[in-house]
Amino acid sequence: MSGPLEGADGGGDPRPGESFCPGGVPSPGPPQHRPCPGPSLADDTDANSNGSSGNESNGHESRGASQRSSHSSSSGNGKDSALLETTESSKSTNSQSPSPPSSSIAYSLLSASSEQDNPSTSGCSSEQSARARTQKELMTALRELKLRLPPERRGKGRSGTLATLQYALACVKQVQANQEYYQQWSLEEGEPCSMDMSTYTLEELEHITSEYTLQNQDTFSVAVSFLTGRIVYISEQAAVLLRCKRDVFRGTRFSELLAPQDVGVFYGSTAPSRLPTWGTGASAGSGLRDFTQEKSVFCRIRGGPDRDPGPRYQPFRLTPYVTKIRVSDGAPAQPCCLLIAERIHSGYEAPRIPPDKRIFTTRHTPSCLFQDVDERAAPLLGYLPQDLLGAPVLLFLHPEDRPLMLAIHKKILQLAGQPFDHSPIRFCARNGEYVTMDTSWAGFVHPWSRKVAFVLGRHKVRTAPLNEDVFTPPAPSPAPSLDTDIQELSEQIHRLLLQPVHSPSPTGLCGVGAVTSPGPLHSPGSSSDSNGGDAEGPGPPAPVTFQQICKDVHLVKHQGQQLFIESRARPQSRPRLPATGTFKAKALPCQSPDPELEAGSAPVQAPLALVPEEAERKEASSCSYQQINCLDSILRYLESCNLPSTTKRKCASSSSYTTSSASDDDRQRTGPVSVGTKKDPPSAALSGEGATPRKEPVVGGTLSPLALANKAESVVSVTSQCSFSSTIVHVGDKKPPESDIIMMEDLPGLAPGPAPSPAPSPTVAPDPAPDAYRPVGLTKAVLSLHTQKEEQAFLSRFRDLGRLRGLDSSSTAPSALGERGCHHGPAPPSRRHHCRSKAKRSRHHQNPRAEAPCYVSHPSPVPPSTPWPTPPATTPFPAVVQPYPLPVFSPRGGPQPLPPAPTSVPPAAFPAPLVTPMVALVLPNYLFPTPSSYPYGALQTPAEGPPTPASHSPSPSLPALAPSPPHRPDSPLFNSRCSSPLQLNLLQLEELPRAEGAAVAGGPGSSAGPPPPSAEAAEPEARLAEVTESSNQDALSGSSDLLELLLQEDSRSGTGSAASGSLGSGLGSGSGSGSHEGGSTSASITRSSQSSHTSKYFGSIDSSEAEAGAARGGAEPGDQVIKYVLQDPIWLLMANADQRVMMTYQVPSRDMTSVLKQDRERLRAMQKQQPRFSEDQRRELGAVHSWVRKGQLPRALDVMACVDCGSSTQDPGHPDDPLFSELDGLGLEPMEEGGGEQGSSGGGSGEGEGCEEAQGGAKASSSQDLAMEEEEEGRSSSSPALPTAGNCTS
């Protein structure tokens, strides 16, 4: 009974064995037995008799809760004595304690009721007197208990005794709960003791805490023992604030001073392990400590006069700390909870909270239950945070304002959680009056479920209540209950918020919204400052379908991508400054080079230079996720090559859509540019639909031969608004050589130039409206137009380069210089030594090799002020190519001596404005293979004299360069414009239907460009015709085989993709672009223009082959030593190397028979692991590919002609070979074995024959494909296709 008694008197705790009589004297001997039933009072108390027996009255003390004793029920003296003891003790203590009704009273009442169950047979006289005395005391206790019954529990029409007893029972339960909290503290008492805490005596503690209490008269300090829960120390201010004597608190449990509803909050917030240590930041000399920053708990502490029948609770903010206190000198220190209690005043009373600071926030669930309440609401509303948590929001609103909540939540749903202001609402304060508040609302939309997770409210008090003391208890009234309208409104709001949010509004709190308008994220905390929208009276949201949900998920992802893109673009979006200085730039041959336009003044450069940045800002959000991935892949690859950061960014994002390399363009724009020159706009015509071609080719006077450094168009196209396949197809240049080229282009003190834009198609209007190609979304028409433009630009640059190549009579195009070096403007030697690429370092020994006589522009010692003459307007070249200055450089080489160029060169010989950049890459560490018999263009063919067409001025006589080595026949593999052969394959199949119409140009002498020298034109034309006649194969065959080879190599070699893209396209460049403008032939089968069925993407392939073959004509066998110094990838070496190199340089000779034997054994071992097509799969494939049903290869793959020797002999089949029968048993289609029947021709004699052909330089293209594919697979042992691997590497 100790617990209840302690809770009752708040003072000392009587021992279980002690007895008290009404007068305070111990009761006399054993109590008398009762012979008769109890009085009529039992009627009021019998109802509760089963809740507790009288045995509890003298139960033993327990720390957790009072326990029932095991007294015998055969005698009632225990009950009688307990009844008297508890009744009298309560009478003696209730007069001195302002505590709530004592639980001992409840026990006495219950004991009295239980007495009726045990009548006694003793004498009636003594028993009646005792019973009368007990009844009298019981009635007295009930009267006192009824006086302490809170007003809100006094209901009308209810039994006062019943309500009193029910309240007493609640008090008993509260006391038991308190004991459980004491137990929690005691279990954790070891943890604070182990902490490093300072120990204070009571005097020291009083001195330290006085610093707080003296500063704030509404503050007092109290120390509560963690071991006993009793007050160890309390400051003097407590008696003043609580209006009671200080001695009342000594030995009292602190929880007894708290309001019952706040006890749990107090104990839950003061666990010793979670409290800060007092000694860490507060000491006698440390000055005041801002304890308000600590975790505070709000509680109501009992106060008022001792005799006040109704205790008055005052709100306090308690800031807890943990420390050790030594009560006396000899006593051990015990861990204590030091509380700094600060009284909370009404915000409308002095000192008042300023009107502009009367703001607080709330958060409630979709069910309209308070989830969080700002502590600033306490002085404004009179409620402590725990009073509102879990309570219905509508319960505290004015009945007339409750329907507004439904409209508010509808607007939240409509605006997708965006903050918005709403009309004022009236909120009921604790004193019963209403406070008018301006409200702002916002909702948090869960990013995955797309539902409103919770609603945030920001409230600013507009009108204060009439009664400024919001903590005044309201007038007695029945306990509030949820009205039906509150329940109905809550249910409607809950159902409303169960719907997913689908709103076209800008991004809300969850970052979801329209993709095209990524608005700023609004903070609910500042929602009053920003209106989310004015959607008034939103109707109910339309029903949501699963497709809409999926669409919104994609919107979420896309929005994140847009934010990522913008974040990357933002730091580099610096304004473009007018270019001034001595920098020489190429003409911009977008349109016909008009002398009037060229004679413009330099001051116009500033506004023009700003155009790309505007386009970048407008189109920054147009980049697709696939494009970002492509750019990141390029960045990662370049980083692996240890390239300078400027080059990495340059290659990674060269267009206005990209956001990672704007800084390079910025530096270039701010670099020096001489009068009369202008740099290329990086994004004015970045893509066909992105911008319009610039009609002003030149701004200023004459042009200098030094061209700006520009990136390859294939890199530019990475970021254009094209589809994923188109994007990747143009990503053929994620290779270090291009990066080095770009790096070598850099002039001294000048960063790389901006991204060039692809040349528009010849059929495109020269000067469309400024916004004619503004991106309006990725449509098929936009993609087709853009693709055609890039293809035409890519082919046109070869035609123009080819004409210039023929002008130099003293040099055959160097294998890697003329072919690939004609891509960017020249870089002076002072810049080149900064390139640290491994591939470039491998070319340092090639300095003697002359640079290609690329007509683009030659590095010359001519002063910068001496530019080339402006190309006349009579140049026959179609002025449809976007300007791309192309420097001449020695690939991967160090500083190269640049021969002087005459300044009197006629302009017609250098139609530079019509050239678009090409990626010219030279891969490191591998020798170039020997030439093969592929037909190549005559671009590299040394011309005896420059062409002199009637429409051209005399060609310049370029100075003879150092003798260049014989041009090596570039591998057809090296000319792909795609980074992945699989992508090329897809594009090839995609281009088949339109390949016929795509081929638009004739031979080198096509009308698309000026006729080159007769010798230059005749040889490639003758070779093309010869191959066309001899092969009798589909034009796609060569590229198909090459695609397979590229597919294998690209997946294994970091430089594999370097062989693709416009790298090799730089090789061929001249005649190929002129003769195969519409659709160049691919790989080995190089047909004439209209017989080419290859995709336009392969324009660089045949053109480079044609010129490579032409250049090979003048090569001597002794010059092959030089060509092999240039090191190419292994797969390229094997593809085109002759027998000498294959047998002596790379691979040791092996016995063909043993190799074939081993391959067969390995292949048989893998038979069970081979895939099998089920019948359903075969039917499904057959529905798409007819050749699957027929068991034959498509024409694109069914190629067995030997291109080198010109024979069309078919490789004999091997129907009798046991290996083929075994493969047939596997259920494999021909295409699964590396290219069809040829792919399976690894067994028997056919295998040896195929490999002999390859070693002799006359193997079939399909065998070449399979050989290269399987040779690489053989190294990694990752492919079962092994029979020919050994042969081809032998």
UniProtKB/Swiss-Prot annotation:
Entry keywords, A to Z: Biological rhythms, Cytoplasm, Nucleus, Phosphoprotein, Repeat, Transcription, Transcription regulation, Ubl conjugation
InterPro entries in the record: PAS, PAS-like_dom_sf, PAS_fold_3, Per1-3_PAS-A, Period_circadian-like_C, Period_circadian_regulator
Residues that bear Phosphoserine: 122, 126, 661, 663, 704, 815, 979-980
Biased composition (Gly residues): 1063-1077, 1236-1248
Residues that bear Phosphothreonine: 121
Protein name: Period circadian protein homolog 1
Listed Basic residues bias regions: 830-847
Up-regulation conditions: Serum-induced levels in fibroblasts show circadian oscillations. Maximum levels after 1 hour stimulation, minimum levels after 12 hours. Another peak is then observed after 20 hours. Protein levels show maximum levels at 6 hours, decrease to reach minimum levels at 20 hours, and increase again to reach a second peak after 26 hours. Levels then decrease slightly and then increase to maximum levels at 32 hours. Levels of phosphorylated form increase between 3 hours and 12 hours.
Tissue specificity note: Widely expressed. Expressed in hair follicles (at protein level). Found in heart, brain, placenta, lung, liver, skeletal muscle, pancreas, kidney, spleen, thymus, prostate, testis, ovary and small intestine. Highest level in skeletal muscle.
Motif (Nuclear export signal 2): 489-498
GO MF assignments: chromatin DNA binding; DNA-binding transcription factor binding; E-box binding; kinase binding; RNA polymerase II cis-regulatory region sequence-specific DNA binding; transcription cis-regulatory region binding; transcription corepressor binding; ubiquitin protein ligase binding
All residue ranges annotated as the PAC domain in the record: 422-465
Record bears the keyword Transcription: yes
UniProt function note: Transcriptional repressor which forms a core component of the circadian clock. The circadian clock, an internal time-keeping system, regulates various physiological processes through the generation of approximately 24 hour circadian rhythms in gene expression, which are translated into rhythms in metabolism and behavior. It is derived from the Latin roots 'circa' (about) and 'diem' (day) and acts as an important regulator of a wide array of physiological functions including metabolism, sleep, body temperature, blood pressure, endocrine, immune, cardiovascular, and renal function.
Residue ranges of the motif Nuclear export signal 1: 138-147
Subunit structure as annotated in this protein's UniProt entry: Homodimer. Component of the circadian core oscillator, which includes the CRY proteins, CLOCK or NPAS2, BMAL1 or BMAL2, CSNK1D and/or CSNK1E, TIMELESS, and the PER proteins. Interacts directly with TIMELESS, PER2, PER3, CRY1 and CRY2. Interacts with BMAL1 and CLOCK. Interacts with GPRASP1. Interacts (phosphorylated) with BTRC and FBXW11; the interactions trigger proteasomal degradation. Interacts with NONO, WDR5 and SFPQ. Interacts with USP2. Interacts with HNF4A.
Location of the motif Nuclear localization signal: 827-843
Outcome following mutation: residue 985 to S: In a breast cancer sample; somatic mutation
Domain PAS per the UniProt entry, residue ranges: 208-275, 348-414
One GO cellular component, as annotated: cytoplasm
